[in-house]
Protein backbone atom coordinates (compact mmCIF):
# COMPACT_ATOMS: atom_id res chain seq x y z
CA UNK A 1 0.00 0.00 0.00
CA UNK A 2 1.34 3.46 -0.94
CA UNK A 3 1.72 5.89 1.94
CA UNK A 4 0.09 9.28 1.44
CA UNK A 5 1.08 12.47 3.20
CA UNK A 6 -0.54 15.89 3.44
CA UNK A 7 2.33 17.54 1.56
CA UNK A 8 5.65 16.56 0.01
CA UNK A 9 8.73 16.92 2.21
CA UNK A 10 10.90 19.72 0.75
CA UNK A 11 14.39 18.48 1.63
CA UNK A 12 16.11 21.41 -0.12
CA UNK A 13 14.22 24.39 1.29
CA UNK A 14 11.87 23.05 3.96
CA UNK A 15 12.29 23.00 7.70
CA UNK A 16 11.25 20.92 10.67
CA UNK A 17 7.89 21.83 12.17
CA UNK A 18 6.14 20.65 15.32
CA UNK A 19 4.21 17.97 13.43
CA UNK A 20 7.49 16.16 12.70
CA UNK A 21 7.82 15.28 16.39
CA UNK A 22 4.16 14.59 17.04
CA UNK A 23 4.03 10.86 16.33
CA UNK A 24 1.66 11.13 13.36
CA UNK A 25 1.96 10.94 9.59
CA UNK A 26 4.40 13.87 9.35
CA UNK A 27 6.81 12.12 11.73
CA UNK A 28 6.48 8.84 9.83
CA UNK A 29 7.20 10.73 6.60
CA UNK A 30 10.28 12.46 8.07
CA UNK A 31 11.63 9.19 9.45
CA UNK A 32 11.05 7.38 6.17
CA UNK A 33 12.35 10.03 3.79
CA UNK A 34 15.35 11.29 5.79
CA UNK A 35 16.37 8.63 8.29
CA UNK A 36 15.05 5.51 6.56
CA UNK A 37 16.85 6.29 3.33
CA UNK A 38 20.16 6.98 5.07
CA UNK A 39 20.13 4.16 7.63
CA UNK A 40 18.21 1.58 5.55
CA UNK A 41 18.43 -1.89 7.14
CA UNK A 42 16.18 -4.81 8.06
CA UNK A 43 15.42 -3.51 11.58
CA UNK A 44 14.35 -0.01 10.55
CA UNK A 45 12.31 -1.28 7.60
CA UNK A 46 10.04 -3.05 10.11
CA UNK A 47 8.92 0.32 11.46
CA UNK A 48 8.88 -0.83 15.08
CA UNK A 49 9.74 1.33 18.09
CA UNK A 50 12.66 -0.95 18.93
CA UNK A 51 14.77 -3.74 17.51
CA UNK A 52 14.88 -7.41 18.50
CA UNK A 53 18.55 -8.36 18.34
CA UNK A 54 20.25 -11.74 18.59
CA UNK A 55 21.55 -12.78 22.01
CA UNK A 56 25.30 -12.78 22.62
CA UNK A 57 27.12 -16.00 21.85
CA UNK A 58 27.82 -18.35 24.77
CA UNK A 59 30.74 -17.01 26.75
CA UNK A 60 30.10 -13.38 25.78
CA UNK A 61 28.54 -10.51 27.68
CA UNK A 62 26.45 -7.67 26.31
CA UNK A 63 27.98 -4.19 26.61
CA UNK A 64 25.90 -1.03 26.25
CA UNK A 65 26.86 2.64 26.28
CA UNK A 66 24.79 5.78 25.90
CA UNK A 67 25.87 9.26 24.89
CA UNK A 68 24.45 12.69 24.08
CA UNK A 69 25.87 15.35 21.81
CA UNK A 70 24.96 19.02 21.92
CA UNK A 71 27.60 21.06 20.09
CA UNK A 72 27.79 24.47 18.47
CA UNK A 73 28.37 24.84 15.64
CA UNK A 74 26.79 21.64 14.33
CA UNK A 75 29.30 21.56 11.45
CA UNK A 76 32.98 22.07 12.29
CA UNK A 77 36.38 21.44 10.67
CA UNK A 78 36.80 17.69 10.27
CA UNK A 79 33.21 16.70 10.97
CA UNK A 80 29.81 17.46 12.38
CA UNK A 81 27.47 16.42 15.16
CA UNK A 82 26.43 13.34 13.15
CA UNK A 83 29.83 11.70 12.80
CA UNK A 84 30.74 12.79 16.36
CA UNK A 85 27.65 10.99 17.63
CA UNK A 86 28.48 7.71 15.89
CA UNK A 87 32.23 7.71 16.54
CA UNK A 88 31.81 8.79 20.17
CA UNK A 89 29.31 6.05 20.95
CA UNK A 90 31.27 3.34 19.13
CA UNK A 91 34.37 4.43 21.06
CA UNK A 92 32.49 4.19 24.37
CA UNK A 93 31.57 0.56 23.58
CA UNK A 94 35.06 -0.31 22.31
CA UNK A 95 36.88 1.02 25.39
CA UNK A 96 34.83 -1.43 27.45
CA UNK A 97 36.56 -4.23 25.55
CA UNK A 98 33.58 -4.95 23.30
CA UNK A 99 33.13 -5.29 19.56
CA UNK A 100 30.51 -2.67 18.64
CA UNK A 101 27.50 -4.29 16.94
CA UNK A 102 24.51 -1.92 16.90
CA UNK A 103 23.56 1.72 17.45
CA UNK A 104 20.36 3.34 18.68
CA UNK A 105 19.81 7.03 17.91
CA UNK A 106 17.46 9.75 19.13
CA UNK A 107 17.05 13.15 17.55
CA UNK A 108 15.52 16.13 19.29
CA UNK A 109 14.76 18.62 16.49
CA UNK A 110 14.03 22.35 16.83
CA UNK A 111 11.07 23.72 14.95
CA UNK A 112 12.43 25.61 11.94
CA UNK A 113 15.60 23.54 11.65
CA UNK A 114 16.45 23.26 7.93
CA UNK A 115 15.66 19.83 6.49
CA UNK A 116 18.74 20.10 4.21
CA UNK A 117 21.00 20.39 7.28
CA UNK A 118 19.19 17.52 8.98
CA UNK A 119 19.66 15.35 5.89
CA UNK A 120 23.37 16.29 5.86
CA UNK A 121 23.81 15.31 9.52
CA UNK A 122 21.91 12.04 9.04
CA UNK A 123 23.99 11.22 5.93
CA UNK A 124 27.16 11.84 7.95
CA UNK A 125 25.94 9.52 10.70
CA UNK A 126 25.01 6.87 8.16
CA UNK A 127 28.42 7.09 6.46
CA UNK A 128 30.24 6.80 9.81
CA UNK A 129 28.07 3.86 10.90
CA UNK A 130 28.55 2.10 7.56
CA UNK A 131 32.33 2.64 7.62
CA UNK A 132 32.43 1.11 11.12
CA UNK A 133 30.12 -1.75 10.14
CA UNK A 134 27.72 -0.85 12.96
CA UNK A 135 24.08 -0.30 11.85
CA UNK A 136 21.60 2.09 13.46
CA UNK A 137 18.81 -0.37 14.35
CA UNK A 138 16.33 1.89 16.15
CA UNK A 139 15.72 5.62 16.29
CA UNK A 140 13.45 8.25 17.74
CA UNK A 141 12.58 11.80 16.66
CA UNK A 142 11.20 14.55 18.93
CA UNK A 143 11.30 18.35 19.23
CA UNK A 144 14.41 20.64 19.70
CA UNK A 145 17.94 19.82 18.40
CA UNK A 146 20.32 17.37 20.04
CA UNK A 147 21.46 13.85 19.26
CA UNK A 148 21.50 11.00 21.73
CA UNK A 149 22.84 7.56 20.98
CA UNK A 150 23.28 4.15 22.49
CA UNK A 151 25.73 1.51 21.41
CA UNK A 152 25.67 -2.22 21.95
CA UNK A 153 28.47 -4.75 21.64
CA UNK A 154 29.73 -8.07 22.91
CA UNK A 155 32.91 -9.01 24.68
CA UNK A 156 34.29 -12.28 26.03
CA UNK A 157 33.12 -13.06 29.56
CA UNK A 158 36.77 -13.01 30.61
CA UNK A 159 37.22 -9.33 29.62
CA UNK A 160 38.04 -7.38 32.78
CA UNK A 161 35.65 -4.59 33.75
CA UNK A 162 37.03 -1.19 34.63
Task: Identify the residue ranges that each predicted region occupies.
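Glycine-rich anion-binding loops of enzyme active sites
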Residues: 62, 69-70, 99-162
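N-terminal glycine-rich phosphate/pyrophosphate-binding loops that anchor nucleotide-derived ligands
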Residues: 1-95
